[in-house]
Amino acid sequence: PPSRFAQRMTAAVLVFACAFTMVHIGIGKFGQWYTDSDLVEQDTNALLLKNDLPEGDYRIDTYKIHDNIGMWLDKSCLQYFGSTAAPSILSFYPGLGVKRDVRSEPEIANYALRGLLSVEYLITTPEKRESFEDEADAGWTYLADVDGYALYHNDNYVPMGFTYDYYVTEATYQTSIKTLRSNLLMRALVFSDEDAAVYGKYLAELPTEKQSELTYDAYVQDCNDRRAQACSMFQMNNAGFHAEITLENANLVFFSVPYDDGFTAYVN
């Protein structure tokens, strides 16, 4: 009878669907049995490390460890997997030649991004130390192995909130090499023509010859210059941050934080 046939077909489809799902998920997880074998250990160690990191509010970076360790540490981290990010990051990162989809994963070779975004410490595992030191620039100092992690300090760290001496126009910025824009942004702010007309009195336009001197040594000097005019205090909470800076002359202060709809800044 037709009803008996329909029942048999339904049962067959359900059996096939269940079997296919089990096999498909099983095969998909095979590769993770090795790569995720130390996930719980790293997450547990991160909870210990949270209490042993140096005090203060700063960004961190990680190298070849599991995703979102920064969340366990309660620190803003360059390496992040998640869709809950400020919309502006979707234009900021690609503008620097850094891929940003559901994951933020700027390569360690982009050393200037670490200074620009005020990364003070980098965390990896002791097993990855040699690999990291082979890939990274010279601006990292190994501190110690702490709670199952290897801790490095960024010698070119610039505190959150710093000033500039120069600016470039958007037209100049758009003609620059994408992979060197992080270097350029350590030297100059980017102004639209309208911004230049209003704020150009505080900064000088970057000379042409300084627009191409974007070497590592020049970056180190730029970090020193930015650090010399940076905030003396920066404190974060769940509503935003409070910062203090003392300047000899009126100037603009750059903070590498989102400023999308819903964000407000107050200056006294």
Task: For the regions a language model picked out, list residue spans one by one.
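Generic recognition of stable, solvent-exposed alpha-helical segments in well-folded globular domains
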Residues: 7-14, 44, 55, 68, ...
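Active-site-proximal structural scaffolding
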Residues: 12, 39-46, 106-107, 115-116, ...
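Short alpha-helical segments and helix-capping/turn motifs at coil-helix boundaries
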Residues: 41-52, 105-110, 127-130, 137-138
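Catalytic cores of large soluble enzymes that bind and process phosphate-bearing ligands
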Residues: 36-41, 247
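Signature aromatic-anchored transmembrane alpha helix within multi-pass, membrane-resident enzymes
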Residues: 2-22
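Transmembrane alpha-helical segments
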Residues: 1-2, 157
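Flexible, solvent-exposed extracytoplasmic
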Residues: 113, 118, 124-268
